[in-house]
Design a protein with these regions (language model features):
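N-terminal small/glycine-rich loop or linker at the start of catalytic domains
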Residues: 1-6, 204-216
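Metal-associated gating/positioning segment near the N- to mid-region
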Residues: 1-54
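Divalent metal-coordination and catalytic microenvironments
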Residues: 2, 23, 27, 61, ...
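Short acidic/polar active-site loop segments enriched in Thr and Asp
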Residues: 28-30, 88, 241
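Histidine/acidic-residue-rich, glycine-tolerant segments that coordinate divalent metal ions
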Residues: 37-49, 54-165, 178-182, 202-209
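His/Asp/Glu-enriched, well-ordered alpha-helical/loop segment
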Residues: 140-166, 236-237, 242-243, 248-289
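A conserved active-site cap/scaffold subdomain adjacent to cofactor or substrate pockets
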Residues: 166-168, 209-244
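Hard-cation-handling environments
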Residues: 175-206, 233-245, 249-250
Length: 289
């Protein structure tokens, strides 16, 4: 599972030590940690810091290095050096790669050292200032919506680039029915593509929104019941490779506020197995992958 701890920079959210303890108690033998810290994990020293902080932990920690310097989406980070220091993949956590050529070059370059590139499935120009799924509920509640199209366009672009460049690409936390279909077709073509789904997208929908509970403000947003059913089918059929907790604790000052002002993110390590097991036969999932 991929997680976001606060250290370094946001220790008030969660330290590495506490996060690893929670992961171990929740049954995880290994986790991948995102680069969304301060400073961002975009160099070998930062990768080594994370590994050194976890040497005696029961749960193994695998760092995901930032794809770009400072996760700003402009200049590529030190991918090779981070890989040599222990980074298992490269991603600007929950930030789309807007520059098409940047992703193209990253996919080409990473092939030199068997690197794995993540591309977050969101087209910002389509998503705009949306904060929830665009649909009946967003209209009824007067909340700005994010069209599912924002996810589909980004994934389609990524797949075209991957077909051109070769290499390995991972699409994290897909959230729609059409995304499952797009990746299914790409796998049929033989592209080296994997994807994940956040556990909460398997059992929560945008029907939770009328209470304006900021715990349900996540990125990608909660979608429809039809999407949830398709995601579950994607898991059991093997199209979706990973179920992730997308554990991202937010401090109370930034979460217990007006819905539109709250930061995206929710905790997920403690509840993940029980929640997933309530909607998916885990034996069936293991056999599928």
């Amino acid at each position: 599972t991929s997680v976001s701890f606060g250290e370094p920079g946001f220790e008030e959210r969660e330290t590495i030590k506490n996060g690893l303890n929670v992961a171990a108690k929740s049954g995880f033998t290994a986790i991948a940690i995102n680069a969304n810290t301060s400073p961002v994990v975009d160099n070998k020293s930062a990768v080594e810091f994370l590994i050194n902080k976890s040497v005696n932990a029961a749960t193994t920690l695998y760092p995901i290095g930032a794809l770009t310097q400072g996760s700003k989406g402009i200049d590529m980070a030190e991918l090779y050096d981070m890989k040599q220091s222990g980074a298992v993949a490269f991603a600007d956590y929950n930030k789309p790669i807007a520059n098409d050529n940047l992703l193209k070059v990253a996919l080409q370059y990473a092939q030199n050292f068997d690197g794995l590139i993540f591309s977050f499935p969101k087209n910002n120009s389509i998503a705009g200032e949306g904060i929830v799924n665009e649909g009946v509920n967003s209209t009824r509640l007067g909340l700005k919506g994010i069209p599912a199209l924002a996810e589909h366009l980004q994934i389609a672009r990524d797949l075209f680039l991957l077909e051109y460049t070769g290499g390995k690409l991972h699409i994290p936390t897909i959230s729609t029915k059409k995304s499952v279909l797009l990746i299914k077709e790409a796998k049929k073509k033989g592209l080296d593509i994997t994807c994940s789904v956040a556990a909460h997208h398997l059992f929560l929908t945008d029907d939770e929104l009328p209470d304006f509970d900021s715990r349900y403000k996540v990125n990608p947003p909660l979608r429809t019941n039809e999407d949830t059913k398709a995601l579950i089918k994607g898991v059991t059929s093997g199209v979706i490779d990973i179920i992730t907790s997308d554990h991202n604790p937010i401090d109370i000052e930034n979460k217990k506020v007006e819905f539109s002002e709250a930061k995206d993110g929710t905790i997920g390590l403690e509840s993940m197995f029980g929640a997933v097991n309530s909607v998916i036969n885990t034996t069936e999932f293991i056999e599928a992958i």
